[in-house]
């Protein structure tokens, strides 16, 4: 009985390592404020954060809480939707002054575009756009190609290229008038960000507390989602 009580107390104590995994691309601006707030609340928790764009093995990687963008994650795990993934074609005012704005999807072929190379697969990720009720993949001829989202953002801000950026990344720059959203009627709406985890009954208290904070702070938070007016 004493051993069981000790084990239960250890499980219910909000302390110890917290293994978090998530995508390297597009999610860092959201994740750090959550971790910072959580650690201020619970200073005895030690976050172990692994960011990579591959989909790992939940058991082998000993994950407590995971994040993913795209469609709903693995079967056998609990997944909660957080935010829509807005993929927004953006340009700086300097780019638009020099090259003008594309008025149609087809016009992208005559513009200088950035391309993102998936760090996990090495493949260039096509731009995804909504066309009517369908989603289409739009290949672009890249003027710059990179597997680093920060470098891609820098190239777009500098006025060198158009880029299709995640809304989480682009939103503060659009609101500050440093970037202009283009072809907004073609922003796809199929994908979302998810938090996922195993059975709540088997979770340590630190994982349950972090998930509760994530849901409280992120679910459809307008700070991270641009409205059509914006």
Where are the predicted features?
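Flexible hinge/capping segments at coil-to-helix
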Residues: 76-87, 91-116, 132
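Alpha-helical "hinge/linker" immediately C-terminal to small N-terminal DNA-binding modules
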Residues: 1-12
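Short beta-strand->loop
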Residues: 79-82, 176-188
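A ligand-binding cleft/hinge motif common to bilobed small-molecule-binding domains
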Residues: 153-178
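Central regulatory/effector-binding core of bacterial HTH transcription factors
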Residues: 16-75, 227-230
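Short beta-strand-to-loop elements that line the ligand-binding cleft
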Residues: 47-51, 115, 137-148, 186
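Ligand-binding cleft/hinge of the Venus flytrap
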Residues: 20, 38, 125-139, 173
């Amino acid at each position: 009985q004493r051993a069981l009580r000790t084990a239960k107390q250890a499980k219910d104590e909000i302390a110890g390592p917290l293994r978090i995994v998530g995508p390297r691309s597009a999610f860092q601006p959201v994740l750090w404020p959550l971790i910072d707030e959580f650690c201020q609340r619970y200073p005895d928790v030690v976050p172990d954060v692994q960011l990579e764009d591959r989909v790992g093995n939940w058991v082998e990687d000993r994950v407590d809480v995971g994040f993913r963008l795209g469609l709903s994650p693995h079967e056998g795990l609990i997944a909660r939707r957080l935010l829509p993934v807005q993929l927004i074609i953006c340009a700086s005012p300097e780019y638009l002054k020099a090259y003008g704005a594309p008025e149609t999807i087809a016009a992208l072929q005559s513009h200088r575009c950035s391309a993102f190379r998936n760090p996990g697969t090495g493949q260039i990720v096509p731009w995804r756009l909504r066309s009517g009720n369908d989603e289409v993949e739009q290949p672009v001829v890249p003027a710059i190609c990179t597997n680093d989202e920060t470098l891609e953002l820098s190239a777009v801000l500098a006025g060198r290229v158009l880029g299709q950026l995640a809304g989480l990344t682009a939103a503060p720059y659009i609101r500050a008038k440093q970037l202009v959203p283009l072809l907004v009627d073609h922003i796809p709406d199929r994908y979302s960000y998810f938090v996922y985890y195993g059975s709540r009954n088997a979770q340590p208290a630190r994982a349950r507390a972090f998930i509760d904070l994530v849901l409280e702070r992120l679910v459809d938070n307008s700070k991270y989602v641009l409205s059509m007016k914006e």
